Regions:
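Zinc-dependent metallohydrolase catalytic domains
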Residues: 1-113
Length: 113
């Protein structure tokens, strides 16, 4: 099955905007101080990991098929990788580079603001 981009576009844009606003708010909360490394992970890595974990779910195939034809929200796994691969900070946080599975060249990344 394929995701209907016409159906999900508005919510996909909202997901990207929300992720960017949350990331900016996280950095504002640091007040210029570096986030501590915890468990070997930087603050930015923990931020993106928490974002991804917030979308964890388990769906039955029938439910997923129904969602893809009637719900304006993309399935949860796409609500993670879709926005994150459009945020430059995600690349820096995890060292994502050309040739990596989810790499998207800068000129193809969506910019909301």
């Amino acid at each position: 099955m394929r995701i209907n981009g016409q159906l999900t576009m508005g919510e996909n844009i909202a997901d990207l905007a929300g992720l960017q606003v949350a990331y900016d708010a996280y950095h504002a909360s640091l007040k210029g101080k570096p986030a501590p490394v915890v468990g070997g992970m930087t603050g930015d890595q923990r931020f993106f990991l928490a974002f991804a974990q917030s979308w964890q779910d388990k769906s039955r195939d029938d439910s997923l098929k129904q969602q893809m034809v009637s719900d304006p929200h993309s399935p949860s796994n796409f609500r993670v990788i879709g926005p994150t691969r459009n945020v430059d900070a995600w690349y820096a946080a995890f060292g994502v580079k050309p040739g990596d599975k989810f790499y998207l060249p800068p000129e193809k990344r969506s910019r909301i603001w």
